[in-house]
Amino acid sequence: MTLSTEMSDASGLAEETDIDVVGEGEDDEEEEDDDDEGGGGRGGGGSRLPSSAQRRRRSYAGEDDLEDLEEEDDDDLLLASRPAASPAPPGPAPAPGTGSGGCSGAGAGGGAGGGTGAGTGGGAKNPLVKPPYSYIALITMAILQSPKKRLTLSEICEFISSRFPYYREKFPAWQNSIRHNLSLNDCFVKIPREPGNPGKGNYWTLDPESADMFDNGSFLRRRKRFKRQPLLAPHAAAEALLLRGAGPAAGAGDPGAALFPPPPPPPACGYGAYGCAYGLQLPPCAPPSALFAAAAAAAAAAFHPHSPPPPPPPPPPPPGAAAELARTAFGYRSHALAAALPGPLQAAAVKAGGPGAAALARSPFSIESLIGRTRGPAAAGAHVSSGAASGTAPGPGGGGCAVQAAAGPAVALTRSLVVAAAAAASSVSSSAALGTLHQGTALSSVENFTARISNC
């Protein structure tokens, strides 16, 4: 009884033990599955191997299952470690015991290698470095190296591209900058292309006065901005020509003579401002200095820029006008005096005839009337006969006027003529000023004049 009871108890314990072992195995499988899922969720960090405590509690019945699971876990670990170690440099595979530590070391090594490579690539020097020269310096270099010291825009760009790789790579962008610097800086002068020289574009050269534009001949620094001096004013150019003694011979080889011709000669009349009709025909005055003439022309143009040109001077009078004007003392003829007289007076004077009519016919202030050279032969004979009669008649003083005439006939005649002319001038001028002339005024003055001559 006792033996059977013990056997039954032993068999019960064995069954319980088997059940417990099977239960533990299932629990272990569940824990291993959880570990596998946790390792897969960590992205290849490696699954944990079952600990030794769990192995001790397992029974012999579940050892085969555990070995299969361990092999599967090893395969999963290898597969997970290969993608993580792929960016690392080739080397020995990490040991199974290293786990996630080997993967982290490989990742750190790969990161360090990548950082070193990036630093090496960024430290390399770029060959396309912009030259330290301005556009004016580049243009000056191109012009100075040319044989004729002149280049077109395309030739300047070609020189810069061949000399500097930076501008060769960026050619279309800076060509307009070269064109603008050529046009806006006074140190560059544009030269038109010759008619027989085919091609496109004008030539560009350096102004001769811009030689000291750069400091000590270095193109890195410009001393000052060059300003072209303005052209000489007309009066300054005329003064320069006068100082150099520019004449017909000198002006033939002087280019300035063509730019600034001498001023035109002044008019031949002495009274140019009022015209030649208001004065005598005098010899032309000396021409003014070219300096003053040019200055006067420039001042007139400055004050009256839109004024019309002055009218041409009137033509000079004929050569006989001076003699005619000198013959008539005050510039009017005898017909002017006759026209000033009323009609009845003119008719009476003509009908009366005699010396009064002759005196009225000619001007009383002419040289001929004063000297008496133009009298007719009848008047001259009457004057001689009256003089002879008066000379033969005895006077109260014994000799009378005959002695006086013999002593100084010319002086007496001159005095009488001057007195008569003065009296006639006063009477005629007053009458002409009043616009009226009484009948017989001119005739009475002439009769008094002839009576004085006859009395002498």
Curated annotation (Swiss-Prot):
InterPro entries, alphabetized: Fork_head_dom, FOX_domain-containing, TF_fork_head_CS_1, TF_fork_head_CS_2, WH-like_DNA-bd_sf, WH_DNA-bd_sf
SUPFAM superfamilies hit by this protein: Winged helix' DNA-binding domain
Supply the alphabetized keyword list.
Answer: Developmental protein, DNA-binding, Nucleus, Transcription, Transcription regulation
Annotated Low complexity bias: 381-393
One Gene Ontology term, aspect cellular component:
nucleus
Consequence of gene loss (knockout): Mice show disrupted cell identity in the ventrotemporal area of the retina and aberrant morphogenesis of the optic chiasm. Their kidneys remain fused, have a disorganised ureteric tree and fail to ascend to a lumbar position.
Residue ranges flagged as DNA-binding region: 130-224
Q: Which Pfam families match?
A: Forkhead
Annotated spans, Disordered = 1-104, 303-322, 381-401
> Any stretches that span the bilayer, and where are they?
none
- Output the Gene3D superfamilies linked to this UniProt entry: Winged helix-like DNA-binding domain superfamily/Winged helix DNA-binding domain (1.10.10.10)
GO biological process assignments: axon guidance; branching involved in ureteric bud morphogenesis; canonical Wnt signaling pathway; dichotomous subdivision of terminal units involved in ureteric bud branching; kidney development; luteinizing hormone secretion; metanephric capsule development; metanephric capsule specification
| Stated role | Transcription factor involved in regulation of gene expression in a variety of processes including formation of positional identity in the developing retina, regionalization of the optic chiasm, morphogenesis of the kidney, and neuralization of ectodermal cells. Involved in transcriptional activation of PGF and C3 genes.
Name of this chain's protein = Forkhead box protein D1
